[in-house]
């Protein structure tokens, strides 16, 4: 039976609720594998695992339970090894890397902050800040709305100003977070967001981070800020080759089997 890996932490094994289950239908019981002072949180791997909502939530729930009181290196959803022995071998082979990253994550949690513009507020802002745009808009109004070409030209200028403001406000958000963050990771670009930042912060400093985000939302009302956390530090595992090596070794072992 293949082994599904949720995350890695130090011994002793974290206290897990009785009957904790993970992925699969029916859900597989979660167990621990220990090697060289490290613990892998695992279960049997289902044969037909798909990234359905229930499975993703089960993966996250195991990590949430395990990381309540200590750092855990979270594996990405779908990390499967050939068997328990292969997981143990990876723990032994990469022990130094895992310990180094666990040290870096000690007492820390991740928050994800996404920012977008309130369209009405940002349009008001760029018009107020740009005399040329105001003059063009007023000229169009005085001419009964302006010609099609004039409207198109104004629209293009406004779009350029809004795009420039997106860059400015993305930098503004990062500057607000940097003094409070141990590390910042930029997430993938996605439509609708001008910034997608993950922040590694001391657990005790989380209130300060949230207060700074709230203050920014007040001082920059054109920003719509969405905060998610605390989360397992997914975004900061990949900065070390530790978790990547574990997953790659597991995948190679599975392919070889």
Where do the model's predicted regions map?
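An interfacial alpha-helical scaffold signature
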Residues: 1-257
């Amino acid at each position: 039976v293949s082994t599904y890996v949720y995350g890695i932490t130090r011994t002793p094994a974290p206290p897990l609720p009785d009957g904790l289950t993970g992925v699969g239908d029916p859900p597989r019981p979660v167990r621990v594998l220990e090697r060289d002072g490290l613990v892998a949180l695992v279960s049997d791997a289902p044969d037909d695992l798909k990234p359905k909502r229930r499975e993703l939530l089960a993966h996250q729930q195991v990590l949430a339970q395990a990381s309540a009181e200590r750092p855990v290196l979270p594996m990405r959803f779908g990390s499967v090894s050939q068997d328990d022995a292969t997981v143990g071998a990876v723990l032994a082979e990469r022990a130094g890397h895992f310990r180094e990253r666990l040290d870096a994550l000690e007492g820390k949690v991740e928050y994800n902050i996404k920012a977008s513009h309130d369209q009405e507020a940002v349009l008001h802002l760029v018009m107020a800040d740009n005399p040329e745009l105001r003059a063009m808009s007023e000229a169009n109004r005085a001419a009964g709305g302006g010609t099609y070409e004039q409207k198109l030209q104004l629209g293009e200028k406004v779009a350029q100003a809004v795009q420039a403001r997106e860059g400015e406000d993305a930098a503004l958000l990062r500057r607000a977070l940097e003094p409070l963050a141990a590390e910042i990771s930029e997430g993938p670009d996605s439509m609708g967001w001008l910034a997608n930042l993950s922040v590694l912060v001391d657990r005790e400093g989380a209130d300060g981070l949230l207060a700074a985000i709230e203050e920014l939302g007040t001082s920059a009302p054109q920003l719509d800020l969405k905060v998610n956390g605390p989360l397992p530090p997914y975004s900061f595992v990949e900065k070390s080759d530790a978790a990547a090596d574990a997953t790659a070794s597991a995948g190679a072992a599975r392919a070889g089997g």
